[in-house]
Amino acid sequence: MNKKTLVISIDALISDDIPFMETLPNLGPIVKGAAQVRDIECIYPTLTYPCHVSIMTGCYPDKHQIVHNEHLQVNVPKPQWNWWYRDIQVKTMLDYAQAADLSTATVTWPVMAGAPADYNIAEIWAPTIQDDPTEICTQANSPAVKEIFERNKHRLKWMLTPEFDNYAEHCGAQIIEMF
């Protein structure tokens, strides 16, 4: 049997939340049996995208160059998000895993659009809630998950939660089942 490593990040989770998580019917058994990193010292700036890239690289933002969730675009009312893997300036766990001939998957992990994961459902959305996400998601996701995306894109409601989380949950489960 192949060994597998699963990295789960729950945005804004703090160590004080873990006892409650252990009581949950689905997440509880996973949390109880998992290796955990508790009481970490956050990077600065403590924003979702820089934090998640630091987890993937082991580097601070001054090295990996993802310093904010969005690009700095002066006088732009809605700046572009830092979605694209190509903007990370150092190697990530994906690069090291591929060099070791391991298969990889990511499901809505920040800054993974266009990532070299074998199975990648990127955290990305269309410009507005009215826009069809198919084109941008097709560019951002790995080709191997095209069918999974098509089956689940009706769950994707722009960047809204809980719909976005529901989309990620279904895509992740199907990646595990299929591959």
Language-model segments: residues:
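Beta-strand elements within well-structured catalytic alpha/beta cores of enzymes
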Residues: 2-16, 29-30, 55, 97, ...
